[in-house]
């Protein structure tokens, strides 16, 4: 199964939406401006149950950023 999906935003022109299907995380960012515009949300109203879980999610966010850099550099930077 594919973990990440990248799609153009249907709400904002020039923005992209990256979804982590394994961990229910969505990142929205403006094309060529990832570092300054990234916005993360959890799907389905998910919330962190503990500080430990929040720290795990930091790893998932880094993995998403690495995937974007490695596979879609032209859209991110």
Where on the chain are the PLM-derived regions?
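Mixed-charge, Lys/Arg-enriched low-complexity segments
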Residues: 40-77
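Intrinsically disordered, low-complexity segments enriched in small/polar residues
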Residues: 2, 14, 32, 55-58, ...
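Short helix-onset patch at the extreme N-terminus, typifying the N->h transition
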Residues: 5-10, 38-41, 70
């Amino acid at each position: 199964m594919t973990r990440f999906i990248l799609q153009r935003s249907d709400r904002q022109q020039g923005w992209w939406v990256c979804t982590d299907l394994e961990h229910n995380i969505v990142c929205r960012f403006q094309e060529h401006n990832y570092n300054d515009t990234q916005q993360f949300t959890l799907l389905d109203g998910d919330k962190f149950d503990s500080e430990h879980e929040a720290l795990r999610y930091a790893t998932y966010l880094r993995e998403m950023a690495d995937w974007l850099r490695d596979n879609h550099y032209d859209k991110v930077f």
